[in-house]
Amino acid sequence: MARLPRLALAGHAHAVLQCGQGERPVFADDVDRAAYLHALREAMAAEHTAVHAWALLPDEVRLVATPADAGGLARLVQSVGRRYVSAYNRRHACRGALWAGRFRSAVLEPGPTVLDALLWADGASALPGHSSAAHRSGGPAWPGLTNPAEFWALGNTPFEREAIWRDRMQLGLVRQREQWLRRAVMGGWVAGDPAFSVDASAAASRPSRPRPRGRPRAR
C-alpha cells in the first residue's frame, strides 16, 4: 500500500516528534542543544512557521508548531535537521544519519488539545535549556517562541498565566492523554474529536484517522 502524504494543515498547530537512531545521543551536552536551537530559530524565520514549544531530549526532539502553509512544517524540520546534523557530525567527528527515518506529526484540534501538546513538550524536562518550560513559567523567554491563543486565554495577566502554567506543569499531563497524543503523532493522524477529523480530512484530501481493522461490512 502506498504511503499517505503527510497530514499538515496551514494555520493549525501540530505536535512533532523526531527520534534519534539510538546508536548515539541526539544531544551530548548544552553546546549541542544550543546549536539545535540556533538552527531552529533560523528555520522558523525562513519557513514562516511559528514554534510554540520544544523539548530536546537525549533520544528525541518534540516540537509544537504552526506552519503558514501546508508544506512549511516539513521544510522547517528538514532545514533544522540538515543544519544540526552537519554541525553535530563536525563537532563529534562522526558521520552518517542522526535521525531514525521521517519525523512524525499530528494536527492538533484548537482548544485543550493544543495546551496538552504544549505540556507534552514543556513537561518533558525541567532542566534549563532542555525544554521551553521556562518561557511560560516566569523564567527567561526564548527568542522567537510564540504562545498560541489557547495559552493567552488562560489568564488576564502574564503573572496569572505563568502561575496557571506552573500549576499545570506540577500536575503533569494525564498519562492516558499523553499516550493518546503520542499515538496520533506516531500514526500521522489528527489529535482531535471526530468532527474536527472530518474537517481535517476534507481540507487535506486524505484520511485523518485510522480506518477500522478488518474487512468492510457487507451492505
Where are the model-predicted features located?
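Short Pro-Cys-Gly-centered "Cys-loop" motif that presents a nucleophilic cysteine in a tight turn
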Residues: M1-L57, T66-R219
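Conserved G/P- and acidic residue-centered "switch" motifs that form tight phosphate/ATP-binding loops
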Residues: R62
